[in-house]
């Protein structure tokens, strides 16, 4: 089963057959299946939409799988959000976009996911207000985890029952952006723009997302889309599970150098 899940190509026939097989044997497969899917999401992140679609199809037939998967994702997020190495921080971002996709296929409550994204940006704003030494790199990273997940479900969420929460997330991000310093680390500047000015990676990301929001065009070629057939079938929240509160741990960073080393700035919005 593990190899079949790993090599699932996302085609309608393969997803339909695999999800039926998994649902039929869920009484004995649940824990293993959840573990396999979580492993695939973190190790093969480019196929995240494929695994989200698979999870949605299995959940529609065996809701206990969806409940266990959401709980596993929440626990993994709490662990990685406080991770001290690059691998854990990457997984936090990957798991966040997986949750966003799960919300579009009826596995997890959409409002719960929007609340989680909002809590990341709120935590960033709280750090900015605190003014503790070295606050900005971690605050930027928390907001980055939330905002960089939006292209993976922005088109759906912006038109869903969570449209207001979606807009509020942008408002919160704008409020945070006004509290942060532009390019606080001179050594982390990216290439100068054509007019010779420095481009701040966080503001660049916000500008790109703002353009997608204004144009209503969230399609990104590098993100494989979930088949429209499945999106229509799975968009209902009838079997969606509560995410619960995701704890965002505080850190013990006490200086700018340590913070910048642990949470380096990004040069562009990366989605893959």
Language model regions located:
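Extended alpha-helical scaffolding segments
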Residues: 93, 101-215
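Short sequence/structural elements of tandem HEAT/ARM alpha-solenoid repeats
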Residues: 13, 28-36, 53, 64-75, ...
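Amphipathic alpha-helical protein-protein interaction segments
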Residues: 8, 23-27, 44, 59, ...
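Helix-loop junctions that connect tandem helical modules in alpha-solenoid scaffolds
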Residues: 3-4, 36-44, 76-88, 120-136, ...
């Amino acid at each position: 089963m593990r190899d079949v899940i790993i090599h699932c190509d996302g085609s309608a026939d393969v997803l339909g057959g695999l999800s039926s097989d998994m649902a039929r044997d869920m009484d004995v497969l649940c824990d293993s299946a959840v573990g396999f899917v979580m492993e695939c999401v973190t190790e093969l992140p480019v196929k995240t939409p494929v695994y989200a679609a698979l999870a949605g199809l299995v959940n529609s037939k065996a809701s206990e799988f969806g409940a266990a998967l959401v709980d596993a994702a929440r626990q993994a997020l709490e662990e990685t959000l406080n991770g001290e190495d690059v691998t854990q921080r990457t997984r936090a971002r990957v798991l966040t976009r997986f949750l966003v996709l799960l919300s579009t296929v009826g596995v997890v409550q959409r409002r719960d996911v929007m609340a989680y994204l909002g809590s990341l940006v709120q935590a960033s704003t709280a750090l900015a207000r605190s003014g503790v030494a070295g606050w900005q790199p971690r605050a930027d990273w928390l907001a980055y985890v939330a905002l960089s997940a939006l292209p993976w479900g922005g088109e759906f969420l912006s038109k869903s029952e969570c449209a207001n929460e979606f807009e509020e997330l942008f408002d919160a991000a704008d409020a945070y952006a006004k509290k942060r310093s532009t390019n606080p680390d001179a050594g982390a500047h990216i290439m100068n723009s054509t007019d010779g000015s420095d481009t701040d990676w966080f503001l660049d990301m916000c500008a790109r997302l703002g353009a997608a929001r204004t144009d209503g065009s969230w399609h990104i070629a590098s993100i494989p889309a979930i088949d429209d057939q499945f999106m229509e079938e799975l968009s209902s929240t009838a079997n969606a599970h509560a995410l619960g509160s995701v704890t965002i741990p505080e850190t013990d960073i006490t200086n700018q150098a340590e913070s910048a080393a642990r949470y380096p700035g990004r040069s562009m919005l990366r989605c893959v």
